[in-house]
């Protein structure tokens, strides 16, 4: 089967030949899944890893299981190049491709998420923003169509502060410390500002925020500021080429990578391998663990790449972002499966998938049954909490691999929840929304 690929604003669509690697073609009676992806441009390497894992998992469900309760998966991937306007164009293209819609959209871009977030309720298409997007959308009473599933940016930011505190001997020892937020100058990079300012006020550390213009491959002036400021820690809120450049430039100015912590979009092999020896010692948050030691990864290797020969790229298997793509696809599949429990074993609509997402309960037993084991923490979504976890763990790049640097942990959950509810309430007032649970 072939997964169709298109390019926004292209004269002609690019379609994969049936049976070609990484592709699943649309067929009548299937569950159509639309992907707003990117595999080219300055963020293409990151996107290729994530979406490679995403499509490989969908292939596994078709090849191993015969679909979801007998309903095969089909779909189309539209290339956005991580561009907001192209992301909107891809969204508009994909939403009409099937009688049941695109199932759920993973924008994989905070900017694209903001650009389409007000469209989702009208179009009845759920948005799954796994570890990115608009943080206050975690409050499903105000944002019933948006699911920042598992953990959000404020979970990441407060988790990083807590991790730094453990390295300094406790929260009390953060008082008077200097922390720099080196951030991608975009909606993505600005998302943690408010919560880090609140943490700085609460814990008494100095916070200096330094933007890096897109795409981030020039950082001399930023690191000159950092060298002059002499911070105790640098938080790297990077994406794409920005993260490797930050590590290499830190080495040039003599800033220790053991005092740098990336967020989970600045902590993959794409970043560290590109940085070379400059990455050694660098810490990063993570939404998921990398590695091939999970039954689900081994099934994909054996069935999708081995037997069916429809895998995306064997070199990416088990990397942090590829595993994250596998996990993201699993959330979509499990939401469809949950929706089928209520609405029947047939292709389900976006409205029905929204109910499935809001009622997801993936406990440790279910994770093990699916072959994910400890790759992810348990997740239980509700109307009030469209995240369902709030946990993060940390890893450190040592030599040529990521090694665990913590167990699953939470940052300042009380602060995060209060800020989510306050921000969501302001949005509700602005948009004249009455906060309530939709049900199904």
Model features per residue range: what roles?
Residues 86, 96, 135-136, 144-253, ...:
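Extracellular/periplasmic Venus flytrap/periplasmic-binding protein
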Residues 250-329, 422, 434-436:
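Extracellular/periplasmic periplasmic-binding protein-like sensory domains
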Residues 23-35, 66-72, 168-178:
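Immediate post-signal peptide segment of exported/extracytoplasmic ligand-binding proteins
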Residues 95-110, 126-130, 178-182, 209, ...:
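Periplasmic-binding protein-like
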Residues 30-32, 45-52, 59, 64-140, ...:
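Beta-alpha junction/loop-to-helix N-cap segments that form part of ligand/metal-binding clefts
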Residues 311-322, 333-407:
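Segments of small-molecule ligand-sensing domains
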Residues 80, 127-129, 133-138, 215, ...:
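Venus flytrap/periplasmic-binding-protein-like
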Residues 1-32, 426-440:
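Short, low-complexity disordered leader/linker segments with a strong preference
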């Amino acid at each position: 089967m072939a997964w169709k690929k298109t390019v926004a604003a292209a004269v002609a669509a690019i379609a994969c030949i049936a049976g070609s690697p990484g592709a699943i073609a649309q067929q009548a009676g299937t569950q159509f899944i639309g992907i707003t992806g990117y595999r080219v441009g300055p963020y293409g390497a990151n996107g290729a890893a994530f979406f490679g894992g995403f499509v490989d998992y969908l292939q596994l469900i078709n090849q191993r299981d015969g679909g979801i309760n007998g309903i095969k998966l089909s779909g189309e991937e539209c290339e956005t190049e991580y561009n907001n306007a192209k992301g909107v164009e891809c969204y508009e293209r994909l939403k009409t491709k099937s009688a049941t819609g695109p199932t759920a959209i993973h924008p994989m871009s905070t900017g694209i998420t903001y650009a389409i977030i007000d469209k989702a309720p009208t179009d009845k298409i759920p948005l799954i923003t796994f570890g990115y997007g608009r943080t206050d959308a975690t409050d499903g009473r105000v944002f019933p169509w948006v699911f920042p599933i598992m953990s959000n940016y404020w979970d990441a930011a407060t988790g990083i502060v807590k991790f730094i505190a453990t390295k300094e001997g406790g929260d009390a020892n953060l008082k008077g410390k200097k922390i720099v937020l080196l951030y991608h100058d975009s909606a993505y990079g600005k998302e943690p500002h408010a919560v880090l300012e609140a943490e700085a006020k609460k814990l008494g550390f100095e916070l200096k925020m330094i933007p890096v213009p897109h795409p981030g491959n020039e950082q001399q002036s930023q690191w000159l500021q950092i060298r002059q400021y002499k911070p105790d820690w640098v938080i790297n809120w990077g994406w794409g080429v920005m993260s490797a450049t930050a590590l290499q430039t830190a080495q040039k100015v003599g800033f220790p990578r053991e005092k740098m912590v990336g967020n989970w979009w600045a902590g993959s092999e794409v970043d560290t391998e590109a940085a070379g020896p400059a990455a050694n010692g660098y810490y990063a948050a993570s939404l998921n663990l990398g590695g091939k030691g999970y039954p689900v990864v081994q099934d994909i290797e054996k069935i999708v790449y081995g037997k069916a020969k429809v895998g995306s790229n064997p070199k990416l298997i088990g990397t942090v972002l590829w595993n994250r793509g596998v996990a993201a696809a699993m959330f979509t599949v499990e939401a469809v499966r949950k929706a089928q429990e209520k609405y029947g074993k047939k292709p389900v609509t976006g409205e029905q998938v929204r109910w499935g997402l809001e009622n997801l309960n993936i406990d440790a037993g279910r994770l093990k049954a699916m072959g994910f084991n400890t790759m992810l923490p348990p997740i239980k979504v509700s109307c009030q909490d469209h995240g369902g976890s709030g946990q993060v763990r940390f890893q450190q790049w040592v030599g040529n691999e990521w090694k665990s640097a913590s167990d699953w942990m939470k940052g300042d959950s009380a602060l995060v929840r209060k800020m989510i509810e306050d921000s969501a309430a302001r949005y509700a007032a602005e948009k004249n929304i009455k906060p309530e649970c939709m049900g199904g």
